[in-house]
Amino acid sequence: MAMVTDGIDPMSLKHDEADSKENITFKDFYPGAIATIKDVKRWKNSKHAEQWTSTIETYAVPILGQLRVKDITRGDILEVLKPIWTEKPETASRLRGRLESLFSQAIAEELIQTNPATWKDGLAFFLPPISKVHEVKHHEAMPLEILKSFAPETAKKTSVVSRAVLFGILTATRVQEFLCARWDEIDIQRATWTIPASRMKCGLEHRVPLSRQALAVLERCERKSELVFPAPRSDKEMVIDSPRAFIRKATGESFTMHGFRSTFRDWCEENFIHEALAERALAHVKGDKVVQAYQRSDLLEQRRPLMQSWADTIMPKKK
């Protein structure tokens, strides 16, 4: 009655609220949905909500953010998942599950009638099972438990290629990035390695915080060349297949340097490392050139404890 007295039509207000709810975008919907799911499921670990939010913000919002929840289709979900389904199967699988939960919440709130992120009778017709993806990736990504033995054993070797491989693992960098590392790119005092844009896949300069273990590798390297890891019998760059050959000889398996980056990424995921830090550590820059230009902070200092923790995990201090 008070609203009528104030000149407000309650029926009109109710209609406006319903219209606003019906037209809600994914970007406006998902924070509240995550909060509701958190409360209903009584999550005890606050990091679960942070991880959900981080994953959704990184992978889903750029594509789904401005779409109305009711307009999102299976095709939109596939656009989100396909780019990472084989490259980051663990992340992709978790993301799909989280999206399915969010859209189930949307159904419960009567925003939609069908769930575009369901697996059975839905996405399963367009994406291979994660188990099959893992079978392929298993041959290239060394499991963490094996890496915990491989890294310390590699540290005992004295060849240039063994040091290059270990440095690459500790810094989670690509083969062409660490094989061509030069001494003038490395600041020992600041424990920072600056890779020039010309050698980066993303075309942007990348600063890498160096852990104690990574610095120890550099201390054992001879400075006979401008290159940190020159070819054994020359001052030229090492053959790009040298690390793979070394790993195969040492393990008898077809593990690759790229696989170590996958192992690092899975470790980040399992330890609730914020998505932005993990992606920056791997020099995965999102968005077009304009978006990249506005991402001024490379989170160097925030990444420093991350890389030290990674190094301590695979090469713990001797007691």
Give, region by region, the residue ranges found by the protein language model.
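Active-site/catalytic core of tyrosine-dependent DNA strand-transfer enzymes
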Residues: A141-K148, R190, R199, P209-G259, ...
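Basic/aromatic-enriched alpha-helical hairpins
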Residues: T5-S12, E22-T86, L102-Q105
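Short, polar N-cap/turn motifs at the start of nucleic acid-interacting alpha helices
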Residues: E185-T192, S254, I273-A293, P316-K319
